[in-house]
């Protein structure tokens, strides 16, 4: 078992990494929260894979448990689904000293976090992420966003969980595409923060190799994320370094209407990382040869490095980013593998990174 502590004063918590964690999660939840009632919020498919195991573990620890299943879709990150969950909690009778558990990926994590922050004016919740992408990213840091009719990610808050429980073995049940999707996010962290993490991907020759070192990949990623959450809890300053590849990647996702079947978050981030690094190397901002190393790793993970979307369309989308202030933006780049930095660029300069 590995524990990584996030020091946020009264909102501090641990990330616990352990294979087979779900089997003794009940005792851990009981010890941490003292709750006698719990509601698991999960999604189609995950309920069958892990839901009943978690219910049994909680109930064996004396915790009365209800499981609420939401559709496995990006469209579930909505106020209508949140309202449905509120109703299910009221019907169940979850008290204010109960606990919510998010069992799933980013969508379930956002729904659960939002409900926890608002139900009974705030109750405890625990993140139990089941995808690599959520294990090393969205489940850590308390950032919660929902979509509304007017647009994506326009409603949200920061509300820290009481703990994040990660079982690396869950990755074995992921389709290959979604395993690689999460690995793309890990490569990103290696690029800007951890050379040795990046080198794990250079040395891996197969998915079996990756799965063997996955606990180490997750540990390194969570350590990085924990550090940046501590020094920049709301992601306004230093934590922006972790947006490496996201500026262009986010534009690609928006242009594709966040359709996972067209492009995943990890795939879009991979393209973003490659394009900014290629341009930065041409400008002398990044050590020569870095782009080719990144390209090798991305291709070994079957992640793309190019997009069919016209550069002018991407540039126009990026110019409208919420991170653009007075025509400028802090762009995350690499000096070399494992060493990232933020560079202020104008909207006009930013457009050149997608050409």
Locate predicted features.
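Residue-level signal for inorganic ion chemistry
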Residues: 18, 40, 78, 129, ...
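A glycine/threonine-rich phosphate-anchoring loop and its flanking beta-alpha core
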Residues: 16, 114-206
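Non-catalytic interfacial helical region
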Residues: 86-103, 112-127
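C-terminal charged capping/lid subdomain of soluble metabolic enzymes
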Residues: 2, 184-186, 286-355
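Active-site segments that bind and position negatively charged phosphate/pyrophosphate groups
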Residues: 199-312
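Solvent-exposed alpha-helices and their adjacent loops that cap or buttress functional pockets
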Residues: 7, 33, 93-95, 118-120, ...
């Amino acid at each position: 078992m590995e524990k990584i502590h996030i020091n946020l004063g009264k909102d501090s918590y641990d990330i616990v990494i352990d294979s087979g964690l779900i089997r003794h999660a009940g005792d851990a939840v009981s010890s941490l929260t003292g709750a006698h009632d719990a509601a698991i919020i999960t999604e189609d498919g995950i309920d069958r894979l892990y839901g009943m195991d978690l219910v049994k573990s909680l109930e064996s620890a004396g915790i009365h448990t209800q499981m609420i299943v939401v559709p496995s879709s990006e469209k579930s990150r909505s106020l209508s689904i949140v309202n449905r969950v509120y109703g299910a909690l009221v019907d169940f009778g979850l008290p204010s000293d109960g606990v919510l558990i998010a069992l799933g990926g980013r969508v379930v994590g956002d729904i659960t976090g939002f409900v926890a922050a608002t139900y009974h004016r705030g109750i405890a919740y625990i993140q139990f992420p089941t995808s690599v992408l959520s294990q090393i990213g969205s489940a850590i840091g308390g950032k919660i966003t929902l979509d509304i009719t007017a647009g994506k990610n326009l409603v949200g808050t920061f509300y820290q969980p009481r703990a994040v429980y990660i079982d690396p073995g869950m990755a074995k049940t992921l389709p290959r595409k979604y395993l690689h999707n999460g690995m793309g996010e890990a490569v990103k962290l290696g690029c800007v923060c951890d050379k040795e993490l990046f080198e794990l991907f250079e040395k891996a020759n197969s998915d079996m190799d990756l799965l063997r070192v996955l606990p180490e990949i997750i540990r390194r990623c969570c350590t990085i994320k924990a550090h940046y959450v501590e020094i920049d809890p709301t992601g306004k300053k230093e934590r922006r370094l972790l947006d490496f590849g996201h500026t262009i990647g986010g534009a690609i996702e928006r242009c594709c209407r966040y359709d996972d079947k067209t492009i995943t978050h990890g795939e879009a981030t991979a393209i973003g990382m490659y394009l900014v690094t290629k341009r930065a190397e041409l400008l002398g901002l990044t050590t020569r040869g870095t782009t080719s190393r990144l390209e090798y790793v991305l291709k070994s993970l079957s992640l793309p490095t190019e997009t069919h979307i016209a550069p002018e369309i991407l540039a126009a989308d990026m110019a409208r980013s919420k991170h653009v202030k007075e025509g400028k933006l802090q762009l995350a780049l690499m000096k070399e593998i494992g060493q990232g930095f933020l560079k202020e660029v104008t909207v006009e300069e930013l457009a050149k990174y997608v050409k």
